[in-house]
Swiss-Prot record:
The enzyme is highly thermoresistant, but not thermostable. The lineage of its organism: Viruses, Duplodnaviria, Heunggongvirae, Uroviricota, Caudoviricetes. SUPFAM superfamilies: Lysozyme-like. Its EC number is 3.2.1.17. Component of the cylindrical core that assembles on the inner surface of the capsid during procapsid formation. Plays a role in ejection of the bacteriophage DNA into the host cell at the initiation of infection. Functions as an exolysin that catalyzes the cleavage of the host peptidoglycans. Its main location: virion. Optimum pH is 6. This is Peptidoglycan hydrolase gp36.
Length: 898
């Protein structure tokens, strides 16, 4: 009985107490299965027998017990509460409306129905309807046995209920059998389809395009086979076909879907199915793009890193990669040129790297420009080189800071490292900060402090490279260091002060902000501007090299005040507004941000005239906050932008009475106009000229492309037009000279010599090609030469001349590359022996007597015969006669040495 009660409870039926409520039971019938069993049920057969054989006694039993049974039936009816709900459930109905006397029958019938439903869901679905009938007949025996002892009326109703229950069970089994049979038929299709998809995926993964194409063709035939098969019903064909296409898209085998779609095999598909498949198709494409994009990004990052590290030196590979990035729309022309330039000038170019290292250590900005780089790029390459040589991060940061501040630069890569150290020290509890980290930061700050004693802008230079989030802390620490407080302690105090400020009310914060803004005009004076944006170039007077024109100073003042006001309004800087030291630090941050947005237009001091103490021959273009050079000019090469602008609008214009007017630049973000404004010596605007920034940007890109082509030619060779003939040449040499310099020198030399395919009379005999000497007298007369042979002889002759030039330079104390090449050119033209006959000229070179040198050359027979070449020699030798300080002032070392 316990098992029967458990089974009944699983059906949701409690004997003697129904839980059905109106509307809870949904009507179900045999019709749901769409398959009806027409054979006789066991219950109907027994019912027919009882109706025929027991007709006489049935009436008596009914007459005797009618009142009692009606009462029982009424009670049951009342307990049901909802007849419609009860009628819809043939299993619950006996418990509610029949008024059965025997509880055992009701439980037995419920157990029977539950058991048969479970059986149908498992093994029963594999039986034919006839096999199931036999099984059901056996299982129904104990249910019919439980009707024994009932009065005829109860028995009749019980058997009728059993008949309905069996009819429902037969319908359920017939539908389950049909589904199972169809599934068995479709299983073969599914197995074959999965095999085809697996082969397609494997072929795609291994890159076997032939196998993949065969798999796609097989998949198309398979789909058409499904849709025309007589082994499965039409609706099942559609279902299996849909499943196959969905699976193919899920596995990113879109070629199957595309082929069938394009061939028209999907035209008869329903709109809903087509819409569903199209959604899966688009999803598959998006997934593939995401995977390919991620893989491409990883591959790109790896390739670019290898190029940066000098591991890839094949320019053809780099060029093909860059061209592909442009064609795919992932890079602009400017980005491609920049990448190729970095490849040409990266760590893989050992000779060039040696030149960069030497220029950095000498503080020679001009030499860096000759090498085609700027201070920031050079410092970053220096850092990579030091890292490759095993230098620690601490040593690299400290030495790099010294080199950078010496040249007025603090790269953002250095700033990020400092910012990271600041965050870690601030996060550590007192006494728990990493000692090495603390020492590193102390050393860096000491370098800055030493530089600030000589040049007040050094600290601001550093701040311009620090991440925005750490600028406040670093500016505060720099100020505190002047008062003897260690950087780590100052950083912790800054954090503590920030916590205190958080507790301040808004009124107090507002008062601090107002006080700071009200005092800005007094603080941002000319002295502040000169100290921050200039450099202490005149060691005698202490003045900076910044232009003293009122218009230029006013630009810096306005930009700094505007930036300071903006920073003061940001609540994260509230901690700096609570003290004089903090306010000074905030002002330094403002100036650093302005520095970052300033493009210097011009070449700096007037080195050509040898004026060491002149102010800077340049003017600023201060971009508004939020505007970048990339947005305005289409390139971030601010150095070349400044050069181009200076050529188009000279920073200084000589006046009729001897004074100089200044040309500065103003950009109005609202109107998008860039103006070159000429100011007189009092800062009054004289003229305004509109500048086309896009045209400037195009010129910058052209120059960078030309520079790249020249570098490519120096490294790998290029055709150079000489007298209308292409002569192949490069910068390779055995003297150890920079290839770029040698390439340019050879191009210049070739134009002087000119190309002649037939031997021509020379001073001592005959020459051919590009000045190749054939011998004295008539030796070589009538000789002809091809451009290829002429190029080969020219490379050999110039290489020999370079060795001679280096030898002469060593004897004469010449170290400048341009001047060494000047001596090599002299040796190429007349030979080393004849060159040495210029004894007085060589002595003037040795004595660095520029006037005597120039006089000696211009008064020579050589000058009379080939004046252009002699003048070129004078020009190339000019850097040798400049003092070392004029080539690259190492103000930092000179000042600290004092």
């Amino acid at each position: 009985m316990a098992e029967s009660q458990r089974a009944s409870q699983e059906l949701g039926i409690n004997v003697g107490q129904t839980q059905l409520q109106p509307g809870q039971s949904a009507r179900r019938g045999v019709r749901d299965s769409e398959v009806n069993y027409s054979g006789p049920s066991v219950g109907s057969q027994i019912l027919d027998g009882i109706l025929g054989a027991g007709q006489q006694i049935a009436g008596k039993w009914f007459e005797h017990n009618v009142q009692q049974e009606v009462l029982r039936g009424e009670r049951a009816r009342m307990a049901g509460e909802a007849e419609e709900a009860v009628d819809s459930n043939v299993l619950a109905k006996p418990f509610v409306k029949g008024g059965w006397r025997k509880q055992d029958y009701r439980i037995a019938q419920a157990d029977f129905s539950l058991k048969m439903q479970r059986f149908i869901a498992n093994k029963g679905r594999e039986m034919t309807p006839e096999e199931f009938r036999k099984y059901l007949s056996q299982e129904a025996t104990h249910v019919l046995d439980s009707t024994e002892g009932m009065n005829p009326n109860d028995a009749l109703q019980a058997l009728a209920q059993q008949q309905k229950a069996e009819e429902q069970l037969f319908g359920m089994q017939a539908k389950a059998y049909m589904d199972w049979s169809i599934d068995q038929a479709a299983r073969g299709f599914r197995t074959q389809g999965n095999s085809i998809l697996a082969k397609a995926v494997q072929a795609q993964a291994t890159g076997d395009e032939l196998s993949r194409q065969l798999s796609l063709e097989e998949a198309g035939l398979f789909y058409t086979n499904i849709m025309t098969s007589e082994d499965i019903p039409l609706e099942v064909r559609d279902k299996v076909g849909m499943q196959f296409l969905a699976a193919s898209l899920d596995m990113n085998q879109r070629g199957i879907y595309e082929g069938l779609r394009d061939a028209g095999f999907l035209d008869s598909m329903s709109f809903d199915d087509r819409r569903a498949l199209n959604g899966l198709y688009e999803k598959s494409k998006a997934q593939t793009r995401a995977k390919e994009s991620m893989a491409t990004l990883r591959a790109d990052a790896d390739f670019q890193q290898r190029v940066a590290n000098g591991a890839i030196t094949d320019l053809a590979e780099v060029e093909a990669y860059s061209r592909g990035m442009v064609e795919e729309g992932r890079w602009s022309d400017a980005q491609a040129i920049s990448f190729m330039t970095k490849a040409m000038t990266g760590l893989g170019n050992a000779q060039r790297m040696q030149g960069i290292m030497a220029a950095l250590e000498a503080g020679d900005i001009n030499a860096l420009h000759t090498l085609g780089t700027n201070v920031t790029e050079a410092l970053e390459q220096w850092d990579k080189m030091q890292a490759a040589n095993g230098s620690s991060l601490t040593d690299r940061l400290v030495q790099g800071t010294q080199l950078g501040l010496r040249l007025g630069t603090f790269p953002k890569t250095y700033g990020e490292s400092v910012g990271s150290a600041v965050r870690m020290i601030q996060a550590a509890k007192e006494g728990e900060a990493n000692p090495e980290l603390v020492n590193t930061l102390n050393s860096i700050f000491e370098q800055v402090a030493s530089a600030q004693e000589i040049n007040p802008s050094a600290g601001n230079v550093m701040l311009s490279g620090i991440p925005e989030a750490e600028q406040g802390a670093v500016a505060w620490a720099l100020k505190q260091m002047k008062m003897g407080i260690a950087p780590a302690q100052a950083l912790r105090e800054f954090s503590a002060n920030a916590e205190v400020v958080k507790q301040m009310d808004e009124f107090e914060k507002g008062q601090n902000t107002k006080a700071f803004k009200d005092n800005l005009g007094k603080q941002v004076n000319d002295k502040f501007v000169n100290n921050i944006f200039g450099r202490a170039w005149n060691m005698l007077t202490g003045e900076s090299d910044l232009s003293n024109n009122e218009a230029v100073l006013s630009m810096y003042r306005r930009a700094t005040i505007d930036e300071a006001n903006w920073l003061a309004s940001d609540r994260k800087h509230a901690g700096l507004l609570t003290s004089d030291t903090g306010r000074e630090a905030l002002l330094e941050i403002a100036a650093a941000n302005v520095r970052n947005r300033t493009i210097q237009v011009g070449e700096g001091r007037n080195l050509k005239e040898g004026d060491l103490f002149s102010r800077r021959d340049s003017a600023p273009l201060i971009l508004p906050r939020g505007t970048t050079a990339e947005q305005l000019f289409g390139t971030n090469d601010t150095e070349t932008i400044g050069t181009v602008l200076a050529e188009q609008h000279k920073p200084h214009v000589e006046g009729l009475l001897g004074y100089k007017s200044v040309v500065a630049f103003e950009y109005d973000r609202t109107s998008g106009s860039l103006l070159a404004v000429e100011y007189d010596e009092n800062g009054v605007a004289l003229d305004r000229t509109r500048v086309d920034p896009q045209a400037v940007g195009k010129e910058v890109l052209k120059r960078n492309a030309d520079k790249l082509n020249a570098m490519r030619g120096a490294e790998y060779g290029a055709n150079v037009k000489v007298s209308g003939t292409d002569i192949r040449m490069n910068g390779g040499n055995s003297a150890g000279m920079l290839k770029q310099d040698v390439f340019n020198w050879r191009k210049e030399l070739a134009q002087f010599e000119a190309y002649r395919g037939e031997a021509y009379k020379d001073a001592d005999g005959y020459s051919v090609g590009l000045g190749h000497y054939l011998g004295s007298g008539n030796a070589g007369a009538g000789t002809t030469v091809t451009p290829e042979q002429a190029a080969q002889w020219f490379a050999e002759d110039t290489d020999r001349a370079l060795d001679q030039g280096v030898r002469l330079a060593d004897e004469l104390g010449v170290t400048n590359n341009a001047s060494i090449l000047g001596l090599a050119g002299m040796a190429f033209q007349m030979g080393e022996g004849r060159a040495r006959q210029f004894r007085n000229t060589f002595q003037a070179i040795k004595d660095r007597n520029k006037e005597a040198f120039e006089a000696g050359v211009r008064n020579s027979k050589w000058y009379t015969q080939t004046p252009d070449r002699a003048e070129a020699f004078i020009k190339r030798m000019a850097p040798h006669f400049d003092t070392p300080s004029q080539i690259g002032v190492d103000w930092y070392s000179a000042a600290t040495a004092e």
